[in-house]
Structures are given as structure tokens and as C-alpha cells.
Amino acid sequence: MINISLLGAGRIGKMHAQNIISNPQCNLVSVYDVNKDNANIVANLCNAKVEDSPEEAINNQEVQAVFIASTTTTHIKYIILSAKAGKPTLCEKPIDLDIDKVNNCYNEIKNLNVPIQIGFNRRFDE
């Protein structure tokens, strides 16, 4: 069983939450969103805990992996926090709108040896 924390409980976050709980090998442990109402809705649907900060969600000792489905401007911060905590991470696209910030993020985490995946669902569309 993989215990997952979800950062972001908006439209895409809800979709990820449903996918997580429909997989018998996964368990949604905690949810964080700046909008507490959204976090509570998703957490209640999934029997998960609402965390008060992204740091609490990522550093929760039960959590083995992190899904990032928050606003784009938070992605780099959350990727770095997750990588430094040693948690494999799936982050929704885009990483950021500024390529220099993306490169800085890469340089900060590249030697941490933590899997980070970006969710590009239409990589090969024409």
C-alpha cells in the first residue's frame, strides 16, 4: 500500500483523489489546499486528514509519495519540499511559466535521487 498526500484540492486535485482511492494499492492519507473548504470536501470523500500546511502534508511520517495539483505558482516550492523530504512526487504540468525558475528547481533537486514525474497527459498529440 502506497500512502499518498495530495497538495491541491481543486478540479484536477479531486480527479487525482478519485484515482488514488480507486487503486487498491494506494491510500490517500492527507490533503492540503489553501482553500480549506476544498480540502475538507476531498478529505471527507476519501477518508483522509486535512493538513494545515504543505510542509505538514509532505513531512507526515505516513506519507510515502506526494501528488501536486495546486496552482502553477506553487509547483516549484512543493517539488523542492517533496524532493528534500525524499518523497517520490507526481506534479501536474506546467512546472512553472518561467524557464529560469524551472532550471533552478532542477539544479536544486537533481542530486537528491528522488523520482519526480510531471503529468503531461497529451505529450504526443498532433
Set out the residue ranges of the language-model regions.
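A contiguous active-site-proximal alpha/beta segment in oxidoreductase catalytic domains
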Residues: 96-126
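Beta-loop-alpha module in the N-terminal Rossmann-like domain of NAD(P)-dependent dehydrogenases
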Residues: 16, 48-108
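General small-molecule cofactor/ligand-binding pocket signal
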Residues: 29, 51, 117
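Short alpha-helical
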Residues: 11, 37-38, 73-74, 97, ...
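Short loop or secondary-structure boundary microenvironments that flank
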Residues: 10, 32, 72, 95, ...
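N-terminal Rossmann-like dinucleotide-binding module
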Residues: 1-46
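Acidic-histidine catalytic/liganding microenvironments
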Residues: 23-24, 60-61, 125
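Short, well-ordered coil/turn segments that N-cap beta-strands
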Residues: 26, 87, 114-115
